[in-house]
Amino acid sequence: YLNIWICKIQPTTIFGLTIGQVLGIAFPPNGLDHWPKGVSAPTAEQDGVVIDFRAVGSNNPNTVAMPGGTGNLTIKGRTSVHEVGHYLGLRHIWGDGGFLGPNDCAQSDGVDDTPFASAQSSFDCEVTKNSCEQVEAFYNDDPLDLVENFMDYSQESCMNMFTKGQAALMRSVLMGPRA
């Protein structure tokens, strides 16, 4: 039902510049409205989740150098949760601004109960971070960025939750395109 491959993923190089270590890769199913067209797996044989062996298991005391030489990410085994989230249709909570669009508060992950964020949390665990104002969307409350969410790029020790909306979306993908 779900293919998971564990292997050594080489650091990503674009135009001859090494931009950092990728810990996992997964493709969402085709035809989801909140994803750009053409981001699903190129072939059926590539439909699944790929995890770097260094990112497997919470008792695997590994650290991986972060992009730009800004420090290390301590591996706690949450990469597979993040990547399966992509496989089940979830985007990053900042709506992939900077990857698939501008880096600003207008990008959405397509889930109503995740607050907007201007960008990923840069592997930090700053629980008071609030990068976007959106009072009207959240019943006269301006929510903080969800650095605890599995679909952010925070320290793995900080990741511990999906929202109810994210859970509902993953369930609908399991009952629909991934059934």
Predicted segments with their positions:
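Metzincin-family zinc-dependent endopeptidase catalytic domain
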Residues: 1-124
